[in-house]
Amino acid sequence: MTITSLNQLDLSRGGYTYADYLLWQLKERVELLRGRIFKMSPAPTIIHQRISMRLSGEFYNFFKGKSCEVFTAPFDVVLPSADGKEDNVVQPDLCVVCDPEKLADGKRCLGAPDLVIEILSKGNSQHDLGDKFHLYEQARVSEYWIVRPTDKEVNIFVLDQGRYRGLAPVVEGKEITSVKFPTLSIHTNDIFD
């Protein structure tokens, strides 16, 4: 049976995997966290899209000609659980992958990207600040940026002995500098209106 609607799935149960996810032909975008289905926000706002495009441009220009690659949503990132099950599938707004082996199948990133960016939107902030924060930490994503359009600030978290350590928020009018890629620096005026 072809799955074309979330109504055909049991959203209360877990145990779904990337293999299941690939069989679905849903109109809605979903993510899997620990085998559970999470509906993604509908089409992002104009502000979200502007920030995403500006960051994408900055990251593309920085990584052009380098070994790392930049990907934007929708792009599947599969983060296997400790038991090896592929039951975590997320679509970050932007991610940087430096290990070509993680891209070997040409369809997804299998394993932790080096840097992930999520842009908060109404309806996804708890998911990005809670569930996905812990998932990225557990998967050992080196650096996680949370962009807050309403506050015009960026929170950067870096992995330190297996746990995320938050840096001081980068506010409007300041420079955002990556810890993982220290020569990558973006002025907030270039991403926020």
Label every model-predicted segment.
Residues 1-193:
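Gly/Pro/Ser/Thr-rich low-complexity, intrinsically disordered segments predominantly at protein N-termini
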